[in-house]
């Protein structure tokens, strides 16, 4: 069960849409003063080298962040250069903040992105769960280098199970009870799909006003095909707004699709401005990451 290591996939196209959506969602939630409890159920190692052995072995950043940056540079030099959409710019600024020399050598995972967005008056709290023994140790070591204080808690635990004790969230320093949860298991175990649905259902019962984000792979597997449908049903039954962003980068020119070629981000109780911001961003990201044939993107909502 511990064969998956995100270091092999850091900065790929799935990370681009995952973190683009994550940043845009939290930015909206932070427009209100109330503190937020933020939970990352499958945190990974937190920070990754894009020039390290793991990422170079997978090479997936070449079809993700590296390709996006290259295409944006080309567009900026063209005659019809257009402003970069706000949500995409926020994502690019976040990546750049971890690479001050201008070269993309480091890629922040969701724990480091979320830590960078915590408001410094202790209003927001970050709770990180990672069960993989190696990644959990790396996460603790990486976070130890941050000036995190008591704003971050790390536990080597099953995020699916530990999430239950996080909701409803405790009152923040401002007295508010607000929560945002990111759920992105590896799905290498088939039961992960069912656990995601069960956890979202449980979350909505425990804390109906929370915002819940789910990343999922788009692969030829019945469980993967059914997951967004089941999340839509849960959201509609709970009368919550939802967004489903999908990106398929397409096949290589030789028709092959080495590695994952499509994934999605589903947001339950989505902020009302999010769909437009994501659509604007994807109008740039989608074409930039497209390859060969079979590429597409969509931003669906209720």
Predicted segments with their positions:
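Class I S-adenosyl-L-methionine-dependent methyltransferase catalytic core
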Residues: 1-302
């Amino acid at each position: 069960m511990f064969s998956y290591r995100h270091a092999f996939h850091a900065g790929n196209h799935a990370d681009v849409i995952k973190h683009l959506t994550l940043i845009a969602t939290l930015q909206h939630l932070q427009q209100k003063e109330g503190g937020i409890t933020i939970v990352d159920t499958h945190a990974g190692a937190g920070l990754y080298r894009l020039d390290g052995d793991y990422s170079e072995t997978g090479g997936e950043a070449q079809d993700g962040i590296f390709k996006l940056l290259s295409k944006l540079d080309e567009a900026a030099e063209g005659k019809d250069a257009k402003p970069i959409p706000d949500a995409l710019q926020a994502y690019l600024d976040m990546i750049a903040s971890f690479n001050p020399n201008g070269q993309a050598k480091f890629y922040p995972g969701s724990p480091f992105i979320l830590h960078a967005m915590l408001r410094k008056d202790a209003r927001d709290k970050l709770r990180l769960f990672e069960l993989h023994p190696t990644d959990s140790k790396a996460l603790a070591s990486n976070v130890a280098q941050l000036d995190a204080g008591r704003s971050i808690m790390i536990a080597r635990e099953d995020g699916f199970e530990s999430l239950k004790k996080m909701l409803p969230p405790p009152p923040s320093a401002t007295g508010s009870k607000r929560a945002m949860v990111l759920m992105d298991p590896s799905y290498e175990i088939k039961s992960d799909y069912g656990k995601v649905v069960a956890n979202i259902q449980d979350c909505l019962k425990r804390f109906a006003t929370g915002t819940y984000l789910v990343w999922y792979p788009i692969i030829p597997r019945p469980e993967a095909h059914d997951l967004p449908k089941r999340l839509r049903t849960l959201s509609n039954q709970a009368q919550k707004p939802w967004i489903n962003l999908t990106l398929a980068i397409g096949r290589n020119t030789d028709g092959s699709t080495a590695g994952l070629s499509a994934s999605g981000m589903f947001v339950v109780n989505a902020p009302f401005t999010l769909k437009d911001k994501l659509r604007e961003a994807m109008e740039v990201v989608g074409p930039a990451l497209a390859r060969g044939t079979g590429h597409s993107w969509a931003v669906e909502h209720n």
